[in-house]
UniProtKB/Swiss-Prot annotation:
Belongs to the asfivirus I177L family. The keyword Glycoprotein applies. One of its GO terms (cellular component) is virion component. It comes from African swine fever virus (isolate Pig/Kenya/KEN-50/1950). This is Protein I177L. Glycans are attached at N11. Signal peptide: none annotated. Its main location: virion. Keywords: Glycoprotein, Late protein, Virion. The lineage of its organism: Viruses, Varidnaviria, Bamfordvirae, Nucleocytoviricota, Pokkesviricetes. The keyword Protein biosynthesis does not apply.
C-alpha cells in the first residue's frame, strides 16, 4: 500500500513498516517508521529510461 502524504512524501506500508520516500531532482531518500533510519540514494546510480 502506498500513498503520497500532504508533505509530498511517498508513504509505502510493507508488513506494518512504513517507508517514507523523499524524492528530489538529484537524489531519493527514504526512512522507515519504526525505526526511522534515513537513507539517501543519489539518483545517478539508477539507469535513466530510454527516451
Amino acid at each position: 500500500m502506498w500513498k503520497v502524504n500532504d508533505q509530498g512524501f511517498l508513504n509505502i506500508t510493507v508488513a506494518g513498516t512504513k517507508f517514507n520516500l523523499i524524492a528530489t531532482s538529484t537524489k531519493i531518500g527514504f526512512y522507515t517508521d519504526p525505526p526511522s533510519h534515513l537513507i539517501i540514494i543519489p539518483l545517478k546510480i539508477f539507469p535513466l529510461p530510454p527516451k
